[in-house]
């Protein structure tokens, strides 16, 4: 097992820009190899560690974390917050910008609804005009052929309708006369019915 000290200088998340292996330096004797420090490095970076592979054989540094894992674990949020100016963070934490933004979004929503209504009206008008233009020959044919046929049918059925109306009128008159004669021949029944 190889024991070495790796010092990583800051770079993009998941990767080290430069590494220093102090484990094999002849100037660092014995067990102090694991505690060797690079001159000028910050205290937080002067931490010795042991690099081994998956089976523990000590085959060098571990593989760097890919960008996809950095994005999926939301490391970019922390990176953005650490690099964002404090004035931006203060502006974001306040609610003064939310009301104008909400009004702007409401205005955009109203404009979109108005455009949608205009598009629907245009579609209905266009479809209706196309339907009327396509149905106009049918309406003209009905006006020329079917309407005269209907008028002729009504005129031909008019005598039959008059005869039926006169027959119903005569039948109702006969029923009235029968009722009148019955009341005159049996006046007692009429009085009983009135009581």
Swiss-Prot record:
GO annotations of cellular component type: membrane
Main subcellular location: membrane
Superkingdom, taxonomy of origin: Eukaryota
Subcellular location, record wording: Membrane
Transmembrane intervals: 105-125, 145-171
Annotated Pfam families: TMEM239
Membrane topology annotation: Multi-pass membrane protein
Keywords associated with the record: Membrane, Transmembrane, Transmembrane helix
Entry-linked PANTHER family: TRANSMEMBRANE PROTEIN 239
Name under which the protein is recorded: Transmembrane protein 239
Gene that produces this protein: TMEM239
């Amino acid at each position: 097992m190889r024991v070495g000290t790796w010092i990583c200088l800051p770079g993009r998340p998941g990767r080290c820009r430069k590494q220093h292996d102090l484990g094999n330096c002849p100037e660092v004797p014995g067990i102090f190899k694991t505690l060797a420090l690079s001159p000028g490095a910050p205290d937080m970076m002067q931490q010795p560690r042991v690099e081994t592979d998956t089976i523990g054989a000590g085959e060098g540094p571990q593989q760097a974390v890919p960008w996809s894992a950095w994005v999926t674990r939301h490391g970019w949020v922390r990176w953005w917050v650490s690099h964002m100016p404090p004035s931006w963070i203060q502006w974001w934490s306040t609610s003064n910008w939310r009301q104008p933004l909400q009004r702007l979004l409401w205005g955009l929503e109203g404009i979109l609804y108005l455009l949608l209504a205009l598009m629907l009206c245009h579609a209905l008008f266009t479809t209706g005009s196309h339907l009327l233009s396509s149905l106009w020959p049918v309406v003209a044919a009905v006006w020329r052929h079917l309407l005269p046929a209907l008028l002729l049918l009504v005129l031909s059925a008019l005598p039959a309708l008059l005869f039926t109306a006169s027959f119903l009128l005569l039948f109702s008159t006969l029923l009235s006369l029968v009722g009148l004669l019955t009341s005159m021949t049996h006046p007692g029944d009429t009085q009983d019915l009135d009581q």
